[in-house]
């Protein structure tokens, strides 16, 4: 157990050492306490794994690769169907995560894009 401020300062002989002791005490007080680790119950872990497996398998069914780590995916978000054209990246556990680069189209935007595909193809050929 550390000595109190009074005991340390009375036992030291110089004023320089007093200021050093005060600095050390302040540093100890400023040290950030470690965050407690939340423990998961065994039942919660298995439920979380089961739901993540279900969502990843349904996600894989609706993903279409169009390039290296680039996919078009169809998903439901808050009751609306979205078509994502997005880059993905691998996390440290080897799981694919969606990246920032990409776009989500609602059904109206997707329909407009499909209608204009032939015009877009023509523009590409001209270049």
Curated annotation (Swiss-Prot):
Extent of Basic and acidic residues compositional bias: 31-44
Protein name as annotated: Activated RNA polymerase II transcriptional coactivator p15
Keywords: Acetylation, Activator, DNA-binding, Isopeptide bond, Nucleus, Phosphoprotein, Transcription, Transcription regulation, Ubl conjugation
Annotated region described as Disordered, given as residue ranges: 1-63
Organism of derivation: Mus musculus (Mouse)
Residue ranges with Low complexity bias: 7-16, 46-57
Paired cysteines (S-S): none
SUPFAM superfamilies recorded: ssDNA-binding transcriptional regulator domain
Gene3D superfamilies per record: Transcriptional Coactivator Pc4, Chain A (2.30.31.10)
Organism lineage: Eukaryota, Metazoa, Chordata, Craniata, Vertebrata
Summary of the function given for this chain in its UniProt record: General coactivator that functions cooperatively with TAFs and mediates functional interactions between upstream activators and the general transcriptional machinery. May be involved in stabilizing the multiprotein transcription complex. Binds single-stranded DNA. Also binds, in vitro, non-specifically to double-stranded DNA (ds DNA).
Cross-link Glycyl lysine isopeptide (Lys-Gly) (interchain with G-Cter in SUMO2), where in sequence: 68
One GO CC term on file: transcription regulator complex
